[in-house]
Amino acid sequence: MSEKLVEVKDLEISFGEGKKKFVAVKNANFFIKKGETFSLVGESGSGKTTIGRAIIGLNDTSSGQILYDGKVINGRKSKSEANELIRKIQMIFQDPAASLNERATVDYIISEGLYNFNLFKTEEERKEKIKNMMAEVGLLSEHLTRYPHEFSGGQRQRIGIARALVMNPEFVIADEPISALDVSVRAQVLNLLKRMQAEKDLTYLFIAHDLSVVRFISDRIAVIHKGVIVEVAETEELFNNPIHPYTQSLLSAVPIPDPILERQKELVVYHPDQHDYTLDKPSMVEIKPNHFVWANQAEIEKYQKEL
């Protein structure tokens, strides 16, 4: 699991030009190992979805590189290169209702990728693939003739998962796949994603703002704040030893089930102006083995004393 499947180097993503230019992501650096679940965590508007959409090619990049299996995939691509990436990289979207064609049957929605890339030889083979995928995500074959509005939110998300996985991808970007779902079905969808990963040897980029969910499913976590990745570490290391003040703030806001402990805990308030980067510029530094933090030299010395 040590092989790097995805690598992001000095990535910047901006929108607009001139005075209206807005930099959504800057200096993003991370890698995703083959077979692991790597999570991007941050508040709404932090840029996490923007990065995910850039990897799959839905957002253009301003500078930097995105590498997939050692090859640069951002920028201009030929049609054959783009098609190859679509085969290998799929996305599960946040809102299952908005991401499914309301006028199409479930059969067509899941089969669309198979049709576009000629991934079957006979109609019988296509039907068998769709039937097997429906069973794998916990849906019935009689659901194939129905339309998305006839399903619950959890069932619609399962359809979205089936649509992505029927392409037999290597890498799946899950953009807050459970945030629009009822609490009662969130665990079911998470368990489904974990099971499918184990069975199909998938690599996940899991985008979320709920740290408790991320802890359950992730191998490593990157914390992003206003377009800047401030900390990257293995899951338990990040939860047990958060270094960046913003990460500490996020973790302190996670609810504790025990009401007595919840009332006693101290919230950490993050103040962005505590960082003085006027002269001493920050960079991503490996402060501990496999634990990276965005800091300048003065902050690194301070953090190391606190370890």
Swiss-Prot record:
GO terms, molecular function: ATP binding; ATP hydrolysis activity
GO biological process: peptide transport; protein transport; transmembrane transport
Top-level taxonomic group: Bacteria
GO annotation, cellular component aspect: plasma membrane
Gene from which the chain derives: oppF
Membrane topology value: Peripheral membrane protein
UniProt keywords, alphabetically: ATP-binding, Cell membrane, Membrane, Nucleotide-binding, Peptide transport, Protein transport, Translocase, Transport
Function, as annotated: Part of the ABC transporter complex OppABCDF involved in the uptake of oligopeptides. Probably responsible for energy coupling to the transport system.
Binding site for ATP: 42-49
UniProt subcellular location: Cell membrane
Annotated SUPFAM superfamilies: P-loop containing nucleoside triphosphate hydrolases
UniProt name for this protein: Oligopeptide transport ATP-binding protein OppF
